[in-house]
């Protein structure tokens, strides 16, 4: 049995964590803008 390329799996993991980080920053930006403008 041949295992999948571990480098490819690492790249996918980094991409997923990057998307989660961008989503978290976006949510925080919305919360802060609501807090400051109200």
UniProtKB/Swiss-Prot annotation:
The keyword Plastid applies. Keywords: Chloroplast, Membrane, Photosynthesis, Photosystem II, Plastid, Reaction center, Thylakoid, Transmembrane, Transmembrane helix. GO terms for biological process: photosynthesis. Pfam families: PsbL. It is a single-pass membrane protein. The chain crosses the membrane at residues 17-37. InterPro entries: PSII_PsbL, PSII_PsbL_sf. Disulfide bonds: none annotated. The keyword Kinase does not apply. GO terms for cellular component: chloroplast thylakoid membrane; photosystem II reaction center. It is found in: Plastid, Chloroplast thylakoid membrane. Its main location: plastid. One of the components of the core complex of photosystem II (PSII). PSII is a light-driven water:plastoquinone oxidoreductase that uses light energy to abstract electrons from H(2)O, generating O(2) and a proton gradient subsequently used for ATP formation. It consists of a core antenna complex that captures photons, and an electron transfer chain that converts photonic excitation into a charge separation. This subunit is found at the monomer-monomer interface and is required for correct PSII assembly and/or dimerization. PSII is composed of 1 copy each of membrane proteins PsbA, PsbB, PsbC, PsbD, PsbE, PsbF, PsbH, PsbI, PsbJ, PsbK, PsbL, PsbM, PsbT, PsbX, PsbY, PsbZ, Psb30/Ycf12, at least 3 peripheral proteins of the oxygen-evolving complex and a large number of cofactors. It forms dimeric complexes. Belongs to the PsbL family. This is Photosystem II reaction center protein L. The lineage of its organism: Eukaryota, Viridiplantae, Streptophyta, Embryophyta, Tracheophyta.
């Amino acid at each position: 049995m041949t295992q999948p390329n571990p480098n490819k799996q690492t790249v996918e993991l980094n991409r997923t964590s990057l998307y989660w980080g961008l989503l978290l920053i976006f949510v925080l930006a919305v919360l802060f803008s609501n807090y400051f403008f109200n």
